[in-house]
């Protein structure tokens, strides 16, 4: 789905609400790409990327339609594979109105297989959005599934209205230059009678037209997030051409019913917070009842919203207004690192921030509010992600609780009435009022759209799902397309196998090498294989136990029995604060541009070398009010962590610390080994890495 926070960075790597942050986010939309994390992500991918797979130039297919318009491929494509072939296929814009002869050109890229002989199939990929360009995800597709190029061609197609297939560009909507309702209405007016013709039903027919024009008899189809709708629409129309299907965190026809997806996702937030905390030793030690504490925070914000200034992860001050609806939005679309997809920033800190709020300290929670990408924001280049296409597809695919012929005022009344009739716990732990927030209500996001004629639906009545090998996967911490929705989608496909992945968020393939191997092998063998590896988190994301206002509020670091430690409890608490300060800056560097401010004061700057090693320098950073941390840390491409820090402040006698360990590394959670001197006494302590 348009995971509205991992889409445009995923275009840089793999990737918006369903599939948003294209630095490493499939199935999320709309966060501007950021150089620092793109460097790290690119470095990570380069170890797998089958760049220059073919020494020769473009290799044209032998059985293709004369209707194809072949063009020179973009440098981004030829840099990955010189043999790539690119073109356009003109297709009818208005299939349901044969008297209208307008055509829309559908852009595609073909990456040919390596072995001799004909391709066994073409592999299709679609990460949905909607609004995302598929071809902009070429690098991550090749990085993740490159081994399948042995006997399979890769066929990447930009859906109509996206990427190079005449991307919809509604400036006010794309760049948030006017209020959303006005911008959406203007976009609908701009498209006019074409409003109804960007639905997934038409996209399925475009896709099969490209398949037929290129001469492929069989295709394997990977659909992630809202791409599940693309696969569904194709499968019920052209199932005879499918060899296999992989659905990763898929949307499907169940989620198109009014409020169903909204409710599933809202209810999944408590599970996401609970699992993230319980798996992290640092958080679990302080929060024995995460469900109760999360409910307590929601009730507190419902009764008394929080407002104040805070900094984004890139150090930009913003005025934050955090009410219950905004808290649901923050929880449903967690701030996630694009360079380390196995990592939840916002939801990993939300319990600790809630505890601080109870004690009168709103700083941690306000910062979380500042760091989330708002639904109404500048989405940048529409050829990477089109907000106009997002609404053009979403609004004709979904079943809305109003009549399209009704005026806006009547639609608003019908929507409000439908929400009021939902059970009071439909969005639990959140209220129905929170569930009507623009950022999380897929119904409200379409209020100001128009549908002048009936569209080509995802499925017509009584659809027949094909009996082909189908693998369906869901992360147990996904709140963009919750597991409850994914299970319903899986049940529609007769030969499906459902697999849940521990500690995975939205679109599991970017969270675990285990999943990459399972999916790639499935396409090769049509067998699911041993899924044991999905039951244990590959990497445990670091969740925060507490935000100490002063060092005395922190947990004391554990004594390293073999290190000759000489410092007492007070200084061991200072060490915990110092490590938290450094890790806090590192976290923010992965979700921002690398440069930002400390929790309470100070700054940090980051850079990444050619080998993917990140250096972050801290200047007067303050995490607890009575401890100041200076120094630098190096986070290696191998996930190693080394820091040299100078500590000062009223809570400590001061000194220097050397820290070694790993951060966000696969495997069980380890401990940072800390040495040095504080107040002239030897330091030898241990602090959990997560």
For each predicted feature, which ranges?
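Glycine-rich nucleophile elbow surrounding the catalytic serine of serine-hydrolase chemistry
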Residues: 133, 223-235
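Catalytic histidine-centered segment of alpha/beta-hydrolase-like enzymes
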Residues: 504-513
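Conserved acidic catalytic loop of the alpha/beta-hydrolase fold
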Residues: 204-218
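Alpha/beta-hydrolase fold active-site neighborhood
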Residues: 296-465, 528, 547-630, 634-644, ...
């Amino acid at each position: 789905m348009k995971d509205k926070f991992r889409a445009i960075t995923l275009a840089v790597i793999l990737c918006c609400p369903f599939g948003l942050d294209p630095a490493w986010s499939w199935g999320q939309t709309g966060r501007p790409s950021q150089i620092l994390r793109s460097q790290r992500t690119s470095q990570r991918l380069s170890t797998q990327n089958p760049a220059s797979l073919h020494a020769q130039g473009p290799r044209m297919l032998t059985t293709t339609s004369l209707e194809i318009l072949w063009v020179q491929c973009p440098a981004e494509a030829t840099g990955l594979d010189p043999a790539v072939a690119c073109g356009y296929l003109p297709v009818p814009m208005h299939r349901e109105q044969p008297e209208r002869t307008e055509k829309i050109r559908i852009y595609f890229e073909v990456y040919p297989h390596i072995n001799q002989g004909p391709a066994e199939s073409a592999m299709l990929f679609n990460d949905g959005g909607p609004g995302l360009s598929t071809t902009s995800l070429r690098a991550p597709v090749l990085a993740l599934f490159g081994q399948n190029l042995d006997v399979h061609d890769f066929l990447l197609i930009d859906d109509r209205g996206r990427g190079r297939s005449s991307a919809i560009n509604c400036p006010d909507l794309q760049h948030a230059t006017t209020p959303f309702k006005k911008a959406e209405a203007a976009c609908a007016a701009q498209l006019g009678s074409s409003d109804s013709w960007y639905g997934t039903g038409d996209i399925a027919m475009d896709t099969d037209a490209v398949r037929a024009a290129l001469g492929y008899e069989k295709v394997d189809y990977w659909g992630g997030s809202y791409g599940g709708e693309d696969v569904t629409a194709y499968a019920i129309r052209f199932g005879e051409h499918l060899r296999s299907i992989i659905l990763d965190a898929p949307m499907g026809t169940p989620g198109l019913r009014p409020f169903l997806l909204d409710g599933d996702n809202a209810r999944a937030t408590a599970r996401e917070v609970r699992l993230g905390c319980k798996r992290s030793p640092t958080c679990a030690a302080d929060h024995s009842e995460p469900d109760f504490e999360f409910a307590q925070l929601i009730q507190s914000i419902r009764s008394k919203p929080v407002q104040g200034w805070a900094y984004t992860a890139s150090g930009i001050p913003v005025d934050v207004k955090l009410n219950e609806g905004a808290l649901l939005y923050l929880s449903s679309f967690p701030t996630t690192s694009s360079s380390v997809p196995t990592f939840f920033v916002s939801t990993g800190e939300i319990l600790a921030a809630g505890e601080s709020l109870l004690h009168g300290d709103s700083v941690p929670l306000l910062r979380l509010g500042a760091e989330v990408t708002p639904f109404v924001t500048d989405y940048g280049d529409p050829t990477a992600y089109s907000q106009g296409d997002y609404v053009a597809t979403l609004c004709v695919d979904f079943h809305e609780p109003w009549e399209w012929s009704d005026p806006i005022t009547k639609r608003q009344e019908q929507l409000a009435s439908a929400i009021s009739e939902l059970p009071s716990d439909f969005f639990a732990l959140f209220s129905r009022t929170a569930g009507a927030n623009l950022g999380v209500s897929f119904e409200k996001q379409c209020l100001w759209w128009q549908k002048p004629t009936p569209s080509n639906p995802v499925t017509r009545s009584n659809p027949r799902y094909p009996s082909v090998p189908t693998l369906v996967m869901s992360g147990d911490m996904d709140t963009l397309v919750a597991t409850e929705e994914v299970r319903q989608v899986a049940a529609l496909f007769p030969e499906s196998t459902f697999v849940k992945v521990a500690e995975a968020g939205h679109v599991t393939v970017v969270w675990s090498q285990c999943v990459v191997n399972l999916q790639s092998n499935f396409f090769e063998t049509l067998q699911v294989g041993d899924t044991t590896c999905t039951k244990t988190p590959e990497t445990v994301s670091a969740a925060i136990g507490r935000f100490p206002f002063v060092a005395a509020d922190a947990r004391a670091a554990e004594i390293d029995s073999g290190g000759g430690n000489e410092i007492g409890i007070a200084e061991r608490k200072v060490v915990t604060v110092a490590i938290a300060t450094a890790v806090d800056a590192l976290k923010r560097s992965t979700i921002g541009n690398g440069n930002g401010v400390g929790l309470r004061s100070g700054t940090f700057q980051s850079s990444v070398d050619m080998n993917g090693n990140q250096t972050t320098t801290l200047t007067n950073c303050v995490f607890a009010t009575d401890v100041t941390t200076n120094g630098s840390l190096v986070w290696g491409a191998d996930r190693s962590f080394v820091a040299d820090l100078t500590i000062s402040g009223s809570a400590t006698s001061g000194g220097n610390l050397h820290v070694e360990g790993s951060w966000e590394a696969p495997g069980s959670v380890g401990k940072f080994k800390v040495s040095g001197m504080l107040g002239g006494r030897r330091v030898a302590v241990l602090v959990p890495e997560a």
